[in-house]
């Protein structure tokens, strides 16, 4: 190549032979976080807890930290369900209402039969059914996920109101169900243990199975995934079904905490929290990228913020504002990360 047509800034031959200058520590750290945002989320959570321990009275007590994790347990499970849906470039807005419906179905069945196992099975089947319906409408009828799940939100809410006659239903006393809320394993609440078990199973499914690889492939590009042999329709319906089932499990966990079935147990607030936990945890709204550990940390971050607001006796409206800010920041970070990774490849 001559000097006339040589691109501006291209190094000379002598400079090409010079050893590359290693990147600075900050640059290397930022690149590592870009490729594995869970590390950055963990650092953020640790900083939040450190600041809260200094600023917020009673935050750093053992009982309060246990309470934060207990409150994050059901949100974590629901957010993992949302993760599966977001990974295929979908979204589930029916989560909050399915929470309430599942809670009411659980308590109503328990009142009618006195059989806790049957009540939980019916509750889980309810969540599964809504997930399958959501996925089927999105895949086969071609209704956008946003519209489908929003409509199913109102259907679930109406059913919960009709079944309960608009009133909260007291859960019949059951030692096992009460123990789920009050018991612990080596000091760790059973609800947290259950959330951890669900998280481990979900991680294995996404990272160690053909189905998990298919989920990510569908999220990146459905056409390419289909040409590669992935059964795209089955994956889409399955992810919505998993999301509905996870929502039902989360509702059972929350019902055990309050020992009451309430038609308004979830609502749009729960839906928004679930999506926020997933997005703050590094899940892309554009599909194909997300992790179970990130979602867990996102849920704990959300519950930490809520706990601090309560302890500081600040208006709950601030919590909603913070949640809105978090999801906007998370979307900006996701956009910049996607651009950075695109430039590096």
Go through each PLM region and give its residues.
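Hydrophobic core segments of alpha-helical transmembrane domains in multi-pass membrane transport
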Residues: 41-53, 82, 153, 157, ...
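Transmembrane alpha-helical segments in multi-pass inner-membrane proteins
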Residues: 247, 258, 262-323
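Transmembrane helix-bundle core of multi-pass membrane transporters
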Residues: 145-208, 235-238, 257-267, 342-345
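Single transmembrane alpha-helix segments in multi-pass membrane proteins
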Residues: 46-112, 136-142, 275-293, 325, ...
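Cytosolic-side transmembrane-helix boundaries in multi-pass membrane proteins
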Residues: 1-48, 220, 227-234, 305-345
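Short loop segments and helix-boundary regions at transmembrane helix junctions
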Residues: 27-34, 86-91, 111, 128-170, ...
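Inter-helical junctions in multi-pass inner-membrane proteins, predominant
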Residues: 55-67, 160-165, 181-184, 205-212, ...
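Helix-loop-helix "hairpin" substructures at the membrane interface of multi-pass membrane proteins
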Residues: 115, 119-123, 129-134, 138, ...
């Amino acid at each position: 190549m001559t000097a006339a047509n040589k691109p501006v800034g291209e190094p000379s031959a002598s400079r090409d032979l010079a050893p590359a200058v290693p990147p600075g520590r900050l640059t290397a750290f930022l690149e590592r976080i870009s490729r594995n945002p869970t590390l950055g989320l963990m650092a953020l959570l640790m900083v939040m807890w450190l600041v809260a321990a200094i600023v917020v009275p009673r935050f750093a007590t053992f009982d309060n930290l246990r309470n934060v994790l207990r409150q994050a347990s059901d949100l974590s499970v629901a957010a993992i369900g949302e993760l599966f849906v977001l990974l295929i470039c979908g979204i589930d807005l029916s989560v909050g209402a399915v929470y309430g419906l599942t809670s009411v179905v659980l308590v109503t069945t328990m009142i009618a039969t006195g059989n806790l196992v049957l009540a939980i099975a019916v509750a889980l089947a309810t969540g599964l059914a809504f997930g399958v319906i959501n996925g089927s409408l999105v895949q086969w009828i071609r209704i956008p996920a946003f519209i489908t799940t929003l409509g199913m939100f109102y259907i679930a809410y109406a059913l919960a109101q009709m079944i309960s006659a608009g009133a909260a239903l007291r859960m019949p006393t059951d030692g096992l169900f009460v123990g789920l809320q009050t018991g612990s394993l080596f000091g760790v609440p059973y609800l947290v243990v259950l959330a951890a078990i669900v998280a481990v199973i979900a991680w294995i499914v996404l990272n160690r199975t053909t189905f998990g690889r298919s989920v990510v492939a569908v999220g990146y590009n459905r056409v390419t995934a289909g040409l590669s042999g992935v059964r795209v329709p089955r994956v889409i319906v399955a992810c919505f079904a998993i999301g509905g089932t996870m929502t039902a499990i989360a509702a059972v966990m929350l019902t055990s905490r309050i020992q009451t079935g309430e038609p308004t147990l979830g609502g749009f607030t729960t839906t928004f929290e679930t999506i926020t936990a997933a997005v703050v945890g590094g899940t892309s709204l554009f599909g194909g990228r997300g992790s179970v550990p990130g979602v867990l940390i996102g849920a704990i971050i959300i519950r930490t913020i809520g706990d601090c607001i309560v302890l500081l006796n600040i208006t709950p409206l601030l919590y909603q504002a913070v949640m809105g800010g978090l999801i906007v920041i998370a979307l900006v970070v996701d956009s910049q990360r996607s651009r950075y990774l695109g430039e590096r490849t």
